[in-house]
Every structure is written in C-alpha cells, then in structure tokens.
Amino acid sequence: MALKRSSSMKTQLVDAIQLEEVEMEEEITTTSNNNNPVEPAQVKEPKCYTVEEAVESIGFGCFHILLFVIMGSANIVEAMEIMLLAVVSPEIRCEWHLEDWQVALVSTMVFFGFMVCGVLCGYIADKYGRWKVVFGGFVWASYFSFLTSFSTSYGWFIFLRCMVGCGVAATSQGFVLKTEFIPAKYRAYLLPLASIFWMMGSILIIVLGMTVVPTMGWRWMIRFSVIPSLVLIGLFMFIPESARFQVSAGNIQGAMSTLKRIAKMNNGVLPEGELREPEVTERGNAVTLISSAFRRTSLLLWYSWFVASFSYYGSVLSSSELLEKNLLCVTDPDLEHQIKHIQEETLCYCIPFNSDDYQTLLISCLGEVALIPLNIILLNIVGRKYSMVILLLLSAFFFMLVNICTTMLGFTILLFLLRSVVSMNFNVVYIYTAEVYPTSVRSIGMGFCTSFSRIGGMIAPFIAQVLMSKSVILALSPFATACIICAIGVFFLPIETRGRALLQDA
C-alpha cells in the first residue's frame, strides 16, 4: 500500500514538472511574439504607393498630350504679353512723344507687377492649389490687357501694363502644374518643347504688328492679342488640380480621382494597394528656401533667374532698338546720337518698324526653337547644371558678336543664334527649379525665382533702350558679363536633378 502511494506521488510530481515546462515554453513564445509583432507569415500589411510611383506606373499617354497642348498654350499668351512691348514701343513713342527712359519704363512696370505678384502667387499656389492661381492669372491678364487698348495717356498705359504683369506672374505657375504630372524620364524631352509655344506667341504678336498696326493701329493689335487668352480660359477646364498638391494638402480622395482619370485617359494602371502619403502641414513656408538644405541652391538660383531674364529681354529689346534706330555698324557715339534724333524736330519723331524689321524679328524668334534638339541632348547627357553653364557661356559669346559690323543677313544670323541660346538657358532654369524644390515649397520657390528674374527684366530696358543710344558695345557688355559670372556660380550648384524623382517634402 505504501509502495503504491509512493508511485502515485512520483507520477503527480512528474506531471507537475511537465506542466511547468509547458507554461514556461508558452511564456517564452508570447514574449518572443511581443518583441517581434510583425511576422510576414502571420500578418500581411496592406500595399500602398505614393503619387510619384503612381505617375511612373501610369506612364505617358493622351492626358500628357492634352496637358502639353493646353499648358503650352499658356506660353503663347505669356509670350504675346511680353513681346507686345517690343512691337508697340515705336508706336507709343510716336503717339505720346516719349523719351527713351519713358519707353523703357513701360517694360519695367510690367516686370515690376510680375516681381511683386510672383512671390504672392507662389505662396497661394502652395497653400490653396496650382490650378486656381493659374486660371485666375489668365482671367486677370486678359482683362487688364484688353483695358490697355483704351489707355488715354501714358500714365494709364504703364499702370494697366503693370496689372498685366501681375496676371502673367500667376500664369507662370502653370509650369509647376505641368511638371508635377510628367514622369521623370519624359521631363527632359517634354519641358524644353515649351519653347515652341513661346515662339508661336512671339510670331503671332509680330504678325499682328505687321498686319494690324499699319492699318488699324496698335490699340486694335492689343485687342486681337487677347483672343488666345479667352480661348485658353475655356480649355483650362480640362486640366485637373495637381495630385501632388492634393496629397500634400491631405486630400487623398481628390488625388485618387485625379490619378484614376489620368490612368483612364492613358490606358494605364495604378499600382496595387492604396494611395498613402503624409499630409504636409508646412506648405508655402519661405523659410525652407533659405534653410541649410536649400540655402546655396536658392541663392544661386535667384541670381541665375535674374541673368536668364536680363539676357533674354536684353536680346529682344536690343535687337528691336538696333533696328528701330538703324544703329547697325555705327560705332561713333556722336553719329549714334545724330541718327537717333534725326526726326526729332518733326511733329512725330518715332521711327516705326518697316517690313524688313518685322521679318528680322520673325527670323530671330525661330531661333528659340531651332536648337531644341540640342537642348534635349544636353539635358539628357550632361544634365541640367552643366547645360546651364554651357548655354550661359555661349550667350556671353554671341552678345559680343552682335556688336560686330556686318550685313543685315549676318546680323540676322547672329541674332538668331543669340535668341536660341538665351531662350534655351531660360528653359533649363525653369526645369531645374521645378525639379529641385519639394512639392511643399515648389510654387513659392518658383515664385521667388520669377520675382528675381523680373528684376533683370526691369533693368534690361534701361540698358538696351537707353544706354544703347550712348554706345552699342557699352550696352551689350553688361549682358555678356552677367552671363559669364552666372556660369561660374551655376557650376557650384549642389544638386543635379537629371532623372531624379520629385520630392514631396523637405
């Protein structure tokens, strides 16, 4: 009996030990699971993707062609409003008996409006959306441009053109809107083609000058020039808000609708899963532009934009001035002064453009697109940064060559090449700026840059239209010098954006 009781106690003791071991194993397993809560075999995370991945997955298609045509047409409107100044200058000089500085002030006031509103429009675009700003800019610019044709005095004319400059500042945000929809590998091919539309706008205003001004006057030319803006206002309804902005503003549902619409038009597919990206609360914060991450980039870009505008409008207005005052091959300042004022004693001492002058301006406009293939090759092979360096040095070279005494054909060829390289440089600066800044500050970054560019545009008329009367080489040298200094600065830009995904937040 005692033996049986002893055997039973041993059995109970063994069972107790085994039970304790099992409990310890379960505790170890539980602890292990707590330390490693995600096991691929046990828990599956839902798939998610970003806007960048969605844009790359959808690819290029019909939507981008529509985007290219409509947003490219915005360049037509902008070019017409800016190039209008070169065509109308001889006419208003005659009508209101203006001095050189007064004619130059017209261009300066347009760029002043652009400069003041550029930063404001960039801030609003980052805060409330790109689409609203661009659409409002078209309406604003067309309205005040139309009012310009009814100007009764020089004062009203420059005020209304200043208001037009504010509207054009808003439309420049269209480049940001366009960039944010294009896949990375296509940006270097599509964005340079914006020059085609700029050329079309320049040609259109020159053709209007040739046909309308001699018969109906400059006022009707301005009225006709508003028509493309009105057409574009209707077409712009087909362009959606930027999906990148919608995500940064926390509007995931709106971004999904936009991406689905693009995918449907392109016959593309969205990545598997759901769109997920954190909301950016600090949107449109200008302090980011001068933070340690972007300080050197911003400072160099601001000067690059200044020079891009300074050299571009310098080339446009210099050619206009040389043709209007017949200063080609005139190197003696006294003779220049004599030619300039040869008709000053008459009632109207302006010298309007003739057909040959208009033809020269037309041919020089073609230079803005003739070298687009070279621009695309440079962007894809040497990148954005070194493309700017090369183009700036070429710009300086051709600015000095324009001063060489040659025939009208030789002058036209030099002008053609000069307009090619300065417009190519302007285009590359646009592309680099849109790519280097994150979505949270892309528009205000572009706004600051365009504002600095308009400072260059404000100064250019006083050199190209006022200093030109003193000495041709004295007027052309500042443009060449600025390009050389800028080329050195661009070399030290810290970021190359070729093939780089667009950042969402800083």
UniProtKB/Swiss-Prot annotation:
Location of the protein in the cell: Membrane
One GO location term (cellular component): membrane
CDD domains recorded: MFS_SVOPL
Keywords noted in UniProt: Membrane, Transmembrane, Transmembrane helix, Transport
Chief location bin: membrane
Cited Pfam families: MFS_1 (PF07690), Sugar_tr (PF00083)
Chain segments annotated as transmembrane: 57-77, 104-124, 133-153, 190-210, 220-240, 297-317, 362-382, 397-417, 444-464, 472-492
PANTHER family assigned to the protein according to its UniProt record, in alphabetical order: SVOP LIKE, SYNAPTIC VESICLE GLYCOPROTEIN 2
Protein name: Putative transporter SVOPL
The organism's taxonomic lineage, starting at the top: Eukaryota, Metazoa, Chordata, Craniata, Vertebrata
Gene expressing this chain: svopl
